[in-house]
Amino acid sequence: MAPSAKATAAKKAVVKGTNGKKALKVRTSATFRLPKTLKLARAPKYASKAVPHYNRLDSYKVIEQPITSETAMKKVEDGNILVFQVSMKANKYQIKKAVKELYEVDVLKVNTLVRPNGTKKAYVRLTADYDALDIANRIGYI
């Protein structure tokens, strides 16, 4: 009966021994870089703050007031766009979320600009299923 492949491989390994010659790795750079090691995610025993801070910029702080100038009214009538004065700290995502939350409408896009007097203005374009004129009436600035 012929020995199995596994047995012959084991025999060769025993004959060869464990002190074989290790192939040296060729280093191409003079700088030694430490290998990346496993970094586990932190699992703190307690929170670093006892009480989390309240929401600094809620929907009512994001949208300060609607702008009712003639040009803003033209945007409402012609472009399905509502115009608001918003907080300087608010970004487009926060403005979109605040309009959706306060006025129950879907927002297509938000354009913002910082005015020379130091306030931020937001042009909020509504989706086709909502009429900006109706929303402006509901808000009460027409």
Curated annotation (Swiss-Prot):
Alphabetical list of NCBIfam families matching this protein: PRK14548.1
Record's keyword terms, sorted: Cytoplasm, Isopeptide bond, Ribonucleoprotein, Ribosomal protein, RNA-binding, rRNA-binding, Ubl conjugation
Similarity section: Belongs to the universal ribosomal protein uL23 family.
One GO BP: cytoplasmic translation
Localization per record: Cytoplasm
Any single Pfam family the record assigns to this protein: Ribosomal_L23eN
Protein name: Large ribosomal subunit protein uL23
Transferase in keyword set: no
InterPro entries: Nucleotide-bd_a/b_plait_sf (IPR012677), Ribosomal_uL23-like (IPR013025), Ribosomal_uL23/eL15/eS24_sf (IPR012678), Ribosomal_uL23_CS (IPR001014), Ribosomal_uL23_N (IPR005633)
Function: Component of the ribosome, a large ribonucleoprotein complex responsible for the synthesis of proteins in the cell. The small ribosomal subunit (SSU) binds messenger RNAs (mRNAs) and translates the encoded message by selecting cognate aminoacyl-transfer RNA (tRNA) molecules. The large subunit (LSU) contains the ribosomal catalytic site termed the peptidyl transferase center (PTC), which catalyzes the formation of peptide bonds, thereby polymerizing the amino acids delivered by tRNAs into a polypeptide chain.
Key word Ribonucleoprotein present: yes
Organism: Saccharomyces cerevisiae (strain ATCC 204508 / S288c) (Baker's yeast)
Molecular functions per Gene Ontology: RNA binding; rRNA binding; structural constituent of ribosome
Subunit description: Component of the large ribosomal subunit (LSU). Mature yeast ribosomes consist of a small (40S) and a large (60S) subunit. The 40S small subunit contains 1 molecule of ribosomal RNA (18S rRNA) and 33 different proteins (encoded by 57 genes). The large 60S subunit contains 3 rRNA molecules (25S, 5.8S and 5S rRNA) and 46 different proteins (encoded by 81 genes). uL23 is associated with the polypeptide exit tunnel.
Cross-link Glycyl lysine isopeptide (Lys-Gly) (interchain with G-Cter in SUMO) residue location(s): K61
GO cellular component: cytosol; cytosolic large ribosomal subunit; preribosome, large subunit precursor
